[in-house]
């Protein structure tokens, strides 16, 4: 069954420009407060100019182009400009340093890079000292003299015609993007995403939050992340809505931005909710038009209730990962919600809980969350040049092993427990890091928390807690361990405590646990 009607991304943008014309498609706000607005017609023209720019630089169908950018209009131009000529976008996490960025360049086979002045010095070093196929760099925010290896993106783009000059045959099965996973526990893998994947993601995510063309979807999630691309941008564009892309998240500025742009949909991660809650209460806290807040794991019930009560919002839970493209389990429009459930399987998907022998488990039994989709259509196609890793998680019949532990109830609601790799084995007992973190997060002095397992010669693993305190607070070990003993089983109480100023997180707010072990 072809849900997207055989339409690739080039056809999508040509149709959107025809249908929505002068309606606002994209608003970008920089950290300095500069705002750029584009109608659907104007945005399609900018995308065409960018596609023509890449063509003049020798980019052809199947070539890989890396983007190392913060949230900005140019990211959107490049993403869809590359897709229009059949080239492949390779977004690089803007927080990565030289070694990790070099690794992605080399393993993606990118031959051209689009970046900004902020990151350019690092890539000068990479070009000079590291082996890669990179032959050209475009800088989005610098006027440059002619140079064999570097060009001004803006100058070149503005010289291009607004109609597409190169339009090779495209298929919805063509690769549109290679998105490298966050690599919180190991080297990132290149997730291959097709035109079909992105088109489907737009329709699916628009369905999930009942998006209309009069909606305004605001996000502060990084554009190089799957959530921003598939849950927000593709959903907004597919519905003919307005997409607001804010360069960087600021707890102090967030509600003002929601109000200014009259946003009706936004998305949040736990880090955002916790930092918003420590802002001083304001009479404007409920002065917004938000209908839904798309939410991704994990939050305690106490934190959820406090946030919803203060800001007058409700959370629409969505569970997924880069490999699933969208939130394949989640709350549904018009359906009941059952916190702390992550929801039920969405349309076009099946979900099961399986044991260690890959056998389905009944309701109430703990096991691995497994999802069935269609590779290259409703879930990722494969890991780039890594068939062994692909075979490890993706079965031939489309069942994807998520590596997450959970269970389901009799009505088909699923419950996330933890990443399997985050389960601590302590003296014969399995302890969920997330469970402990949700309990410890309710301590009034604690702003942020993560627990990890560390080697223990007697009990397999001991539990260590890393906490960040609220400003001006102090916390003794005695007070901390007493709190834990009163709120969790004895075998779950951490053995060690370390108080830190911050915790290492990736772009989507996930703790980088390998940096703490």
UniProtKB/Swiss-Prot annotation:
Its EC number is 6.2.1.48. GO terms for biological process: carnitine metabolic process; fatty acid metabolic process. The keyword Ligase applies. The keyword NADP does not apply. Signal peptide: none annotated. It catalyses: 4-(trimethylamino)butanoate + ATP + CoA = 4-(trimethylamino)butanoyl-CoA + AMP + diphosphate; crotonobetaine + ATP + CoA = crotonobetainyl-CoA + AMP + diphosphate; (R)-carnitine + ATP + CoA = (R)-carnitinyl-CoA + AMP + diphosphate. SUPFAM superfamilies: Acetyl-CoA synthetase-like. Keywords: Ligase. It is an enzyme of class 6 (ligase). GO terms for molecular function: carnitine-CoA ligase activity; crotonobetaine-CoA ligase activity; medium-chain fatty acid-CoA ligase activity. Pathway: Amine and polyamine metabolism; carnitine metabolism. Transmembrane segments: none annotated. It comes from the Bacteria. PANTHER family: ACYL-COA SYNTHETASE, MEDIUM-CHAIN ACYL-COA LIGASE ACSF2, MITOCHONDRIAL. Catalyzes the transfer of CoA to carnitine, generating the initial carnitinyl-CoA needed for the CaiB reaction cycle. Also has activity toward crotonobetaine and gamma-butyrobetaine. Belongs to the ATP-dependent AMP-binding enzyme family. HAMAP family: CaiC. This is Crotonobetaine/carnitine--CoA ligase.
